[in-house]
């Protein structure tokens, strides 16, 4: 024991370091006086102490201390610099995003084009015009986009409270948006829209690089390089900037003094207000007469709901994107619930069962061809228009022998896709909120599985049960993406792959003729060994109405007392109607020669905007919204020669076409079709009428009775009001609600 007590503390190695000063504990000795593990390395604490005491580390510590002292004394960037940088970044973002909408023009004979025209038509020229229209045309579209992006930028700044970090994030997001927009426009002639974000949410984000074409890879690489450097610069500036926070605040001790409390409150208020402003602007932009809609309009915003690419080009991709981010679909019915919808489904299941007991046929035993004939209508029904020659003698005669009548259209000279959407879905535009301008662009992209009537054939014949043709461009009204959701196996257009086969034109018309359009349908019939649903949207009679066709006999046949200019357009249109009339007669004759049962639903979508004199008279509002339709079956069909009574068919609207076709075919129906059949009986025609000569906008709901008389909502019968309420419930459930009806077989043909 004495030996142990007399043991000395282990001495330090020969390094000149006093172990006691280092704070390293002594190494204990064993009973023999030897150090334990004497041959093992020195303890970690000792090694660390030695390292820290070395000259290099001492120098590094001094450098860090000096750097910290410098950082504490770093200057604060003035707020004016923030404002200047924000303005420059946002201006560049507007131009970069808009740049993606433009393409360099091509000329058939470049030598015939002067240098100034080439300059103005170039991408820099188009960008210059986009900005200069502020003082040239008093259209402040560039300023509007600048202010909107400013809202986004400021919201990021106030939420993060770090100007340079927020600027880096803003620049990255806007650059990605600009590049993605440019690539999508080059590939599909469509800008980026909110529904595209679903591509990432569905787990396909990793595949996005596969869509980048080779000629755009340099743009992507250059943008990535630019963003890397910009991010480095912004992060460096964040370190250098002595104003670490835009708004001084402290979360560690938020109530330590009055100054801290005020700073924290300002920070919270600024973040909440900036986000609320951006949210409110986006939420209301697509709603007519809202504050953001009116403010944007005052700066020159001119919504183009018929075309996202036209809207993005004219108003900016940012405005187009935010406009489609939210649209009010319709108000929720007060009694909407799962219990209500279950009871409704049960009621119409019973109705369908009763109807089907007296019907012998199936819809899917027939090929149904739904033809939207662009702008087709009878010119002689327009007040003040008189011809000595009938422009549509064949269809007029046909209407006397088959189910036919007049269709109430929502608009004049436009809104084609709205009428088309009604015909394919059975939904009525009149039941949507007035802010719903174009369901194809504002509703369908947000729906997961929208219901359309072609799906009846798909349920029997699979994915080849339905096909569509449109001899124009697929980006119009987002038909390409919407038709995929509808379940069409293919939409053949001028720019589809493969293209629509027959593209013949007549005279100098820029549009594919109806005869060529019909030939595409005939080819589809010949290539299928089963019944199918075929959708055709024609283009021949689309505006403008120039002197396309030679030997226009209606120049002489027009005896209307109108101005020469107005008569010129009307006569040009009448010639197109005459050509459609003959092409349709030939088409139906060819259908009669086949042994396949075929039924055609033919309708004009709206009247052309050429009747200025008639449109000036408010009494002509309804006649100028009535087009011609017929439902016809060929000789191979058991419904050949069928003509529904006038009480049922004289007046209707496109949402009822499939219900009328089922009745014409004596075919069994689903509960949904049973509901539409009853609705058509109670309310023969319903439409949100735009009474002016315009394609889009607000309109009042118009109801027609079986004789075509206008009926106000107050004067609807009790049964009609209940029917209308059921219709609203169904439409809400299918579009904005929980889709309860799909769980009860509401769309299944029994």
Where are these regions (language model features)?
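Acidic/Ser-Thr/Pro-Gly-rich, low-complexity N-terminal segments
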Residues: 1-35
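Transmembrane and membrane-interface helices of multi-pass
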Residues: 3, 16-17, 28, 39-307
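Serine-centered coil/turn micro-motif
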Residues: 54, 58, 290, 316, ...
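Short hydrophobic "helix-edge" motifs at membrane interfaces and signal-peptide entry regions
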Residues: 135, 363-365, 594-596
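Alpha-helix initiation and N-capping motif
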Residues: 197-200, 315-318, 338, 392, ...
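Membrane-interface segments at or immediately adjacent to transmembrane helices
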Residues: 282-370
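Solvent-exposed soluble domains appended to multi-pass membrane proteins
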Residues: 354-359, 372-373, 378-750
